[in-house]
Swiss-Prot record:
Transmembrane segments: none annotated. One of its GO terms (molecular function) is 16S rRNA (adenine(1518)-N(6)/adenine(1519)-N(6))-dimethyltransferase activity. GO terms for cellular component: cytosol. InterPro entries: KsgA/Erm (IPR001737), rRNA_Ade_diMease-like_C (IPR023165), rRNA_Ade_Mease_Trfase_CS (IPR020596), rRNA_Ade_methylase_Trfase_N (IPR020598), rRNA_adenine_dimethylase (IPR011530), SAM-dependent_MTases_sf (IPR029063). Pfam families: RrnaAD (PF00398). This is Ribosomal RNA small subunit methyltransferase A. PANTHER family: DIMETHYLADENOSINE TRANSFERASE, DIMETHYLADENOSINE TRANSFERASE-RELATED. It comes from Bordetella pertussis (strain Tohama I / ATCC BAA-589 / NCTC 13251). It comes from the Bacteria. The keyword Transcription does not apply. S-adenosyl-L-methionine binds at residues 13, 15, 40, 61, 85, 103. Disulfide bonds: none annotated. The keyword rRNA processing applies.
Length: 265
């Protein structure tokens, strides 16, 4: 086995359970000519079986030692190694129809999910291993304790499905939390979408800044500009009770009313 030591600063937990690897690859269902990008290949647990099924793979790896190892293990015509922090990579550069996969570092999972939204037009689907708690928030419904800003922002852009849990023992070193695998497929171009992505993001962030308080109080100076009845939002509603479509309507209404602090598209 490799002498490579997991580096805490990179949030490294290497997947070692072959049955879990097989389940992930089966869920992805790669075809020979698929355009696949793997984030954080680590010790190649997913890289190997993916390359058994596809012609070429692009891997994004921040750890220079692991990047060098990958270059030694696989020929350049089969594997392109991008040695970089995934948070700085423009995934749109890899072309259309991308299938993005990876055992994501848990310490940057939410920022990375938001970063990847910028390339959603180029993406066919995404399959990620994440902390189970994060995935529960991603797929949560309004009214549940897990429903959050992350839920709203991602559900406005993706159709998501939690596939299965993964025990800590499947990793080396084992994390202190249970993991899970999620499938994310970008919604079509004709989806319900806000007039301004920036305004939508601002409104959702402000709404969840005090999630237990009534939304009218949290929005404060915007409350008088909001057509509450038209949006179907109850006077006592909290952010965690408001659906994605209602948040899109809320952001659009505030933008149209000239609410201060909202950037026009």
């Amino acid at each position: 086995m490799s002498a490579h030591q997991a580096r805490k600063r990179f949030g490294q937990h290497f997947l070692t359970d072959e049955s879990v690897v097989e389940s992930i690859v089966r869920a992805i269902g790669p075809a020979r000519d698929d355009r696949v990008v793997e984030i954080g290949p680590g010790l190649s647990a997913l890289t190997r079986p993916l390359l058994d099924r596809i012609d070429h793979l692009t891997a994004v790896e921040i750890d220079r030692d692991l990047a060098a190892r990958l270059r030694r293990q696989y020929p350049a015509e089969r594997l392109t190694v991008v040695e970089a922090d995934a948070l700085t990579v423009d995934f749109a550069q890899f072309g259309q129809g991308l299938r993005v996969v990876g055992n994501l570092p848990y310490n940057i999972s939410s920022p990375l999910l938001f970063h990847l939204m910028g390339a959603a037009e180029q993406v066919r689907d995404q399959h990620f291993m994440l902390q189970r708690e994060v995935i529960d928030r991603m797929v949560a419904e309004p009214g549940s304790g897990d429903y959050s800003r992350l839920s709203v922002m991602l559900q406005a852009r993706y159709r998501m499905e939690k596939l299965f849990d993964v025990a800590p023992e499947a990793f080396d070193p084992p994390p202190r939390v249970v993991s899970a695998v999620v499938r994310m497929a970008p919604l079509p171009a004709d989806r319900l979408r806000p007039a301004s992505d920036a305004a939508f993001e601002t409104v959702v962030a402000r709404a969840f800044s005090q999630r237990r308080k009534m939304l009218r109080r949290v929005l404060d100076d915007w409350a008088a500009l909001t057509p509450w009845d038209e949006l179907g939002i109850a006077p006592t509603a909290r952010a965690e009770e408001v659906g994605v479509a209602q948040f899109i309507g809320l952001a659009d209404a505030l933008l149209a009313a000239g609410a201060p602090g909202l950037a026009r598209p």
